[in-house]
Curated annotation (Swiss-Prot):
Keywords: Cell membrane, Membrane, Transmembrane, Transmembrane helix. Belongs to the UPF0295 family. It is a multi-pass membrane protein. HAMAP family: UPF0295. This is UPF0295 protein GWCH70_0499. It comes from Geobacillus sp. (strain WCH70).
């Protein structure tokens, strides 16, 4: 079975959402240390930092999303946003590319990495 790919924007949004849940879990763990105010406060502040990090990631992906190229997916016909040379449709996971040299090739996220000249 092949690698499960997802669009880059959706991956970053999922990461930001997971930061929120981690923050809540860390804060919840802090409640178990009610007898030690210092440890409880430490866990609460750490959880808050996870939630603030999530806010920063959401803000960053929002600004990145406004600069993304909008294309119409040939498979489902919906407008999707692309980051980089190759990406997947956000709705149907159809491989998309803006580079004519990559058309017809097997989808690989490595095409987005810049090659170093040696």
């Amino acid at each position: 079975m092949g690698i499960k790919y997802s669009s880059k924007i959706n991956k970053i949004r999922t990461f930001a959402l997971s930061l929120i849940f981690v923050g809540f879990i860390v804060m919840y763990i802090g409640i178990f240390f009610r007898t030690s105010p210092f440890v409880m406060t430490l866990f609460m502040i750490l959880g808050l930092l996870f939630i603030i990090a999530s806010t920063v990631v959401y803000f960053w992906i929002g600004t990145l999303s406004t600069r993304a190229v909008k294309v119409v997916c040939p498979s489902c016909g919906k407008i999707t946003k692309m980051l980089g040379k190759v990406d997947l449709c956000m709705f149907c996971n159809e491989p998309l590319t803006l580079d004519p040299e990559l058309e017809g090739k097997e989808f690989d996220e490595k095409y987005n990495r810049k090659k170093r000249k040696s």
